[in-house]
């Protein structure tokens, strides 16, 4: 079974269950499994229409519903996702974008100050999508996530299901003992890790995601495993607020 199949099965079982909850200032926002899958499919179809099949796409940002929907839109098609540490300095992010052969980028609004440097120093970058629904005054080649979703909604063709041995994601090591290295994980690597951990949770069980989302453990055990159980993943916006958010 692939992540795409795990996600589709979860939506069939838990469609109206809340998949993600997060804080927007003081307001708690939610997105159901059905709503999330619709966005994932729109992103996936949009990327196919933009001719990114078989290519590498980087993501830079902290945990957000836009981040995880974009990641799933990438890996459930025939594209390789490259999640990068949002806390790295601009120069290191440029190096990782280039070394990973990423040809597109999903970027959080917090990292917009880096945008000009990325466009100037990452020659393979063709397009950048901001992980924000409404964005103004964007330079050429930069778009909002809403524009990609809209393209996907109007596209007739969907991406085929990826091969089990295709590279789903490249996750870079921390680089504490030298230059960070990109670890290639296949579709089967991700799915088998999700299926190998035997835990049971009632649909709608609230799970607080604390670790940075680009970490392999956080991605697989918090998000992908949680989705397989029909859990509600609650985004912790800051370690300083963790106790408050748990309540």
Identify the function of each model-found stretch.
Residues 1, 116, 136-167:
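Flexible, low-complexity linker/hinge segments
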Residues 7-31, 136:
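AMP-dependent adenylate-forming
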Residues 15-18, 130, 150-172, 179, ...:
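Conserved pre-ATP/AMP-binding loop-to-beta segment of ANL
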Residues 29, 44-88:
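Conserved AMP-binding/adenylate-forming
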Residues 30-34, 168-194:
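Conserved AMP-binding A3 loop
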Residues 37-42, 155, 183-203, 207-210:
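Conserved structural elements of the adenylate-forming
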Residues 76-147:
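Structural core segment of the AMP-binding/adenylate-forming
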Residues 191-206, 213-247:
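Conserved AMP-binding/adenylation subdomain of ANL enzymes
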């Amino acid at each position: 079974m692939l992540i795409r199949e795990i996600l589709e099965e979860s939506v069939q079982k838990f469609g109206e269950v809340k998949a993600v909850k997060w804080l927007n200032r003081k307001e708690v926002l939610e997105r159901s499994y059905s709503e999330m899958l619709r966005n994932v499919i729109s992103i996936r179809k949009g990327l196919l229409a933009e001719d990114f099949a078989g290519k590498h796409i980087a993501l830079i940002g902290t945990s957000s519903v836009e981040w995880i929907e974009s990641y799933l839109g990438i890996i459930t098609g025939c594209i390789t996702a490259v999640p990068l540490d949002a806390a790295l300095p601009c120069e290191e992010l440029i190096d990782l974008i280039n070394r990973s052969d990423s040809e597109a980028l999903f970027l959080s609004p917090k990292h917009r100050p880096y945008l000009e440097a990325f466009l100037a120093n990452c020659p393979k970058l063709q397009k950048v999508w901001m992980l924000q629904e409404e964005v103004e005054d964007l330079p050429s080649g930069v778009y909002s996530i809403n524009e990609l979703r809209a393209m996907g909604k109007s596209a007739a063709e969907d991406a085929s299901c990826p091969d089990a041995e295709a590279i789903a994601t490249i996750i870079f090591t921390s680089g504490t003992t030298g230059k960070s290295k990109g670890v290639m994980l296949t579709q089967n690597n991700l799915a088998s890790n999700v299926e190998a951990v035997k835990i049971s949770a009632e649909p709608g069980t609230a799970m607080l995601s604390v670790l940075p989302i680009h970490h392999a453990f956080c991605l697989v055990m918090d998000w992908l495993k949680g989705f397989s159980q029909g859990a509600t993943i609650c985004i912790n916006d800051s370690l300083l607020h963790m106790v408050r958010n748990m309540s």
